[in-house]
């Protein structure tokens, strides 16, 4: 799965007011990035070959989970309307370096999960659930057609290779069957394209998971 050299800070939803401002959905855990920058880039699709358009950031203000942006040269509602649906992105190279065993969520999406104990591929990471448990859960579409949720904990993690898109784990016997049943019983997740948002990194937790026997 090819990766984009860009990460997304926000997605422009619509014009805001009549002075050329736009309101955008935040896709970053680091909104202070807007205060640090004079320029950002706009694109319809960060994964495409088309070069994003560089824009001067004239102002911003936060509004709950959204941000109001004003770009230099965009001074009317008609001009702002032309920006509807665009993503606000920055180069991937501007992300902060990570500690060992930590990863940005966007880099985990699309990784193959391998079970070292069983010597086989489990499936591919489709999402990361940070809400349902005291540890982060890798949401994996398994080879057998089921969906499983695997705790991203150091007790299970053998090797994390986001460059090679591979996560090697040592999973307790029966864990996949139990967690696949739990995941299937929940409401189905909406299928959507995950943008490479600039999110806080997650680290394999130190917490020892409950005994799976």
Swiss-Prot record:
Where is the protein localized?
Answer: Cytoplasm
Q: Membrane as a keyword?
A: no
Q: What is its main location?
A: cytoplasm
Region (Disordered): which ranges?
A: 182-213
- Check the record and name the Gene3D superfamilies matching this protein: PRC-barrel domain (2.30.30.240), RimM (2.40.30.60)
Going by the UniProt record, its keywords in alphabetical order are: Chaperone, Cytoplasm, Ribosome biogenesis, rRNA processing
Q: Where is the composition biased (Basic residues)?
A: 189-199
Note on domains (UniProt) = The PRC barrel domain binds ribosomal protein uS19.
Record's NCBIfam families? 16S_RimM
Q: What does this protein do, in the record's words?
A: An accessory protein needed during the final step in the assembly of 30S ribosomal subunit, possibly for assembly of the head region. Essential for efficient processing of 16S rRNA. May be needed both before and after RbfA during the maturation of 16S rRNA. It has affinity for free ribosomal 30S subunits but not for 70S ribosomes.
Into which family does the record put it? Belongs to the RimM family.
Q: What is this protein called?
A: Ribosome maturation factor RimM
Organism from which the protein derives: Acidobacterium capsulatum (strain ATCC 51196 / DSM 11244 / BCRC 80197 / JCM 7670 / NBRC 15755 / NCIMB 13165 / 161)
- Report which gene this protein is encoded by: rimM
